[in-house]
C-alpha cells in the first residue's frame, strides 16, 4: 500500500553522544568500582572527552525532529561535553585516577560532525543537519531549511563538531549535582 516504505524512501538518521547510564557507559562502570572499594579509578587517557545526553533527551530529540525531516539527512544535537577525568572526580572526589592507556578502537574524542562533511552541514539553534551526499530524485534537497521551515546556516569548510573543541562542558560541580539527583530518584 501507499503507507509502506519503498526503495525510494529516504529516512533520517539521528546521531547523538553517550547515553548517561546506558550499558557500556562509564558511569555504571565507575559506580561498580566505587561500590567495590577500588583504590583508584582507571582512566584510559587524561584528555579523553565525550558528548553527554540522557536517555530522555535522546528520545525527545528524535521525536522533536520528525516534523523537521525531509529524508536522508543526519540530525545532530548540540550537547555538552564531559572530560572523563572530571566525571571520575565528580563521582569519587577522594579517589585518585590511574591512567591505563587507550584500548584498541577507542577514540580520544567523539566526532559527531566530521570536517569532511562540512560542505553539506548546516547549523541551527540547537542542532546540526548533515545533508545526504547523494541526490534523491523528486526531493527538495535544500537542507539549509527544515521541513518545518526553520533556516540554518552552512558551517565553514573544515568545521568539525567534536567533544574536545565543544564550547559547552559540564563542570565537576554540575556532574556532582546530576549524580546526586540520580541517587535521590
Regions found by a protein language model. Name each.
Residues 1-9:
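Single conserved hydrophobic/aromatic residue that forms the stacking wall/gate
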Residues 10-13, 155:
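Gly-rich Lys/Arg/Thr-decorated short loops/hinges at beta-loop-alpha junctions or inter-strand turns
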Residues 13-18, 29-53, 57, 61-80, ...:
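A conserved pocket-lining segment of Rossmann-fold NAD(P)-dependent short-chain dehydrogenase/reductase
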Residues 65-136, 173-185:
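Mid/C-terminal beta-alpha module of Rossmann-like enzyme folds, strongest
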Residues 124-156:
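C-terminal, low-complexity/hydrophilic appendages and adjacent surface loops
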Residues 152-185:
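Generic C-terminus detector
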Amino acid at each position: 500500500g501507499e503507507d509502506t516504505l519503498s526503495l525510494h524512501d529516504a529516512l533520517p538518521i539521528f546521531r547523538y553522544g553517550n547515553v548517561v547510564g546506558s550499558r557500556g557507559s562509564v558511569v555504571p562502570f565507575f559506580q561498580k568500582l566505587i561500590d567495590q572499594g577500588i583504590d583508584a579509578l582507571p582512566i584510559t587517557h587524561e584528555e579523553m572527552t565525550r558528548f553527554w545526553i540522557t536517555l530522555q533527551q535522546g528520545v525527545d530529540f528524535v521525536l522533536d525532529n520528525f516534523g523537521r525531516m525531509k529524508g536522508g539527512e543526519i540530525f545532530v544535537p548540540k550537547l555538552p561535553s564531559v572530560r572523563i577525568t572530571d566525571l571520575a572526580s565528580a563521582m569519587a572526589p577522594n579517589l585518585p585516577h590511574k591512567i591505563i592507556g587507550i584500548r584498541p578502537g577507542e577514540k580520544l574524542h567523539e566526532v559527531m560532525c566530521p570536517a569532511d562533511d562540512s560542505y553539506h552541514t548546516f547549523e541551527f539553534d540547537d542542532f546540526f543537519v548533515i545533508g545526504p551526499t547523494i541526490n534523491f530524485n523528486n526531493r527538495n534537497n535544500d537542507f539549509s531549511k527544515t521541513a518545518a521551515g526553520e533556516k540554518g546556516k552552512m558551517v565553514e569548510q573544515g568545521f568539525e563538531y567534536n567533544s574536545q573543541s565543544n564550547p559547552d562542558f559540564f563542570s565537576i560541580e554540575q556532574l556532582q549535582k546530576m549524580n546526586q539527583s540520580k541517587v535521590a530518584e
